[in-house]
């Protein structure tokens, strides 16, 4: 849960005072420490949760003292930890936390997770692609909440807790991860909020998440349109099982003899792509703004005779693999979710294979899967072993996602469960819900091209006018997955924009995104898809005012 914060010691006498007053006492009439302590041990009835559980309880409640200053300031709040129990006694609990500000703005925000989840996101964190020059949600007075989606990664799991996938072997845990935990967490959190603030529910409730959390943001808009007033979905892995299949395709391509580009060769490729395409947008700034116009041919880096001759060139097997993982794949069998393929990654138009952890890694995929292999390859390995075959000893390299044989039906079944791809959001829009959808064009883990396909599917299903009435889609040139060592680390106050749209009806107008890399001062217009920033050729290249949005 991030840095350890000072906690106010709550005297037992305060707990007794609140217990004697009962739950009808106005929230402001009792000391915050006592009100907070009184939550400990409170039952969360199964009847208040919209999906099956066996109920739960608050396991801990402690008042957290104010901390930080300026935009990093976090006010006093009650931090509540709770557990929701499964129907299947073999399934793990859902563990969740809720932060309840003493000075509350009457609004709530749920954070999404990442990867396979397994930990609770920091309640004092920021929204994905959030601003560095504005307070975080909890610092603004939002009640914030999040969960581990129904399983707990072991402490110290390597290379990161978000790659722990053993829980997938349990059906209820799998359903929770696939979306059910979102509803259960939301209902339990609102129950706690209502209890703490004396029967007062939030006036607005929002959801913000990236990657798996971006999928979760779209899931709540698609499945529980009455529960959230607005969602921020960033680099969403919405078609999760289909993406897993593409990870499998990548894994097999890169495991071929001599196919894996070493880290120095990954950097070689990235630098060559930037050199070739950076100026296509009229400005040489390390960012490829006109990404669709870039189609780099890795053959220009070919080693003599196509043989591996060191890190200054690429062999024929490496060129073949790089082209394969940069290209679309169509699956030659039907998937129950309706997905038909995956569009590939922009490694030949600006994405960096060498991004730490999230890129291709430093070691070729193998069986058993190395902890130094790429994130997507380890993700595939866990999915095959625990969700598909449910055999921890299964060699994931032996399963061909283009010809899965006896596993075809199981894979199709998983796509129906995990792909969150309903493009008809009229129920959500019809009750006033708003959607902000963002993706970086240099994403090395979840392709922005897939998000483009989802958005275009929305337009095809609903019509452009209806989509424009409730949704905005922005592509951010140079931004990658989670702003990790990105050419352009995107920062935009999407929460203020979303809240204004929901509460006043004013849609985002001429938004500006800031590069939040250390020492960076540049800004760019945040252009609605399909436009991208275009430099005017005269103004400061660090000022968004020197750019317009266009498609040429």
Segments from the language model and where they lie:
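Short beta-strand/loop motif that positions the catalytic acidic residue
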Residues: 436-439
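Catalytic-loop region of hydrolases
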Residues: 28-107, 119-126, 130-132, 283-288, ...
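Cap/lid segment of the alpha/beta-hydrolase catalytic domain
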Residues: 114-202, 245, 393-417, 475-480, ...
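Alpha/beta-hydrolase fold nucleophile elbow
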Residues: 199-211
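Secretory targeting and sorting signals
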Residues: 1-29
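A catalytic-pocket lid/entrance helix-loop region that shapes and gates access to the active site
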Residues: 219-221, 226-330, 490
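Histidine-bearing beta->alpha loop at or near hydrolase active sites
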Residues: 470-485, 517-519
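Glycine-rich nucleophile elbow surrounding the catalytic serine of serine-hydrolase chemistry
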Residues: 209-219
């Amino acid at each position: 849960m991030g840095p350890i914060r000072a906690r106010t010691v709550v005297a037992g006498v305060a707990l007794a005072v609140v217990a004697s007053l009962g739950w009808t006492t106005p929230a402001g009439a009792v000391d915050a420490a006592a009100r907070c302590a009184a939550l400990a041990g409170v039952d969360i009835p199964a009847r208040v949760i919209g999906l099956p559980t066996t109920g739960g309880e608050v396991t801990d409640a402690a008042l957290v003292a104010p901390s930080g200053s300026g935009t990093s300031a976090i006010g006093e709040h009650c931090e509540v930890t709770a557990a929701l129990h499964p129907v299947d006694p073999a399934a793990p609990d859902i563990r969740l936390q809720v932060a309840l500000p003493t000075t509350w703005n009457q609004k709530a925000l749920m954070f999404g997770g990442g990867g396979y989840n397994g930990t609770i996101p920091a309640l004092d964190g920021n929204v994905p692609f959030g601003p560095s020059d504005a307070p975080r949600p909890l610092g603004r007075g939002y009640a914030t909440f999040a969960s581990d989606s129904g399983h707990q990664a072991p402490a110290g799991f390597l290379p990161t807790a978000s790659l722990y996938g053993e829980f997938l072997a349990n059906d209820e845990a799998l359903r929770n991860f696939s979306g059910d935990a979102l509803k259960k967490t939301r209902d339990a959190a609102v129950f706690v909020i209502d209890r703490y603030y004396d029967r007062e529910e939030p006036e607005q409730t929002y959801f913000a998440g990236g990657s798996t959390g971006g999928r979760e943001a779209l899931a709540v808009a698609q499945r529980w349109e009455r529960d959230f007033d607005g969602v921020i979905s960033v680099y969403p892995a919405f078609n999760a099982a289909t993406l897993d299949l593409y990870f499998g395709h990548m894994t097999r391509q890169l495991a071929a003899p001599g196919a894996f580009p070493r880290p120095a060769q990954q950097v070689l490729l990235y630098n060559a792509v930037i050199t070739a395409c950076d100026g296509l947008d009229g400005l040489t700034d390390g960012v490829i703004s006109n990404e669709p116009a870039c189609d780099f041919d890795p053959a220009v880096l070919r080693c003599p005779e196509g043989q591996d001759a060191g890190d200054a060139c690429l062999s024929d097997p490496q060129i073949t693999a790089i082209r394969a993982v940069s290209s679309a794949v169509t699956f030659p069998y039907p998937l129950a979710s309706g997905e038909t393929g995956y569009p590939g990654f922009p490694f030949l138009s600006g994405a960096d294979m060498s991004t730490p952890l999230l890129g291709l890694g430093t070691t070729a995929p193998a069986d058993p899967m190395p902890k130094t292999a790429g994130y997507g390859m380890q993700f595939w390995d866990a999915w095959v072993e625990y969700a598909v075959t449910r055999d921890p000893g299964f060699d994931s390299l032996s399963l061909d996602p283009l010809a899965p044989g006896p596993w075809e039906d199981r894979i199709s079944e998983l796509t129906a469960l995990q792909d969150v791809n309903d493009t008809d959001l009229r129920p959500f829009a019809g009750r006033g819900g708003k959607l902000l959808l963002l993706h970086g064009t240099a994403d090395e883990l979840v392709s922005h091209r897939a998000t483009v396909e989802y958005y275009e599917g929305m337009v095809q299903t609903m019509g452009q006018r209806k989509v424009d009435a409730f949704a905005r889609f922005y592509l951010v040139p140079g931004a990658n997955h989670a702003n990790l060592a990105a050419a352009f680390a995107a920062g935009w106050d999407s929460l203020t924009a979303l809240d204004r749209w929901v509460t006043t009806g004013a849609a985002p107008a001429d938004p500006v995104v800031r590069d939040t890399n250390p020492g960076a001062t540049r800004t760019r217009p945040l252009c609605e898809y399909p436009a991208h920033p275009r430099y005017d050729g005269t103004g400061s290249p660090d000022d968004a005012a020197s750019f317009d949005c266009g498609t040429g």
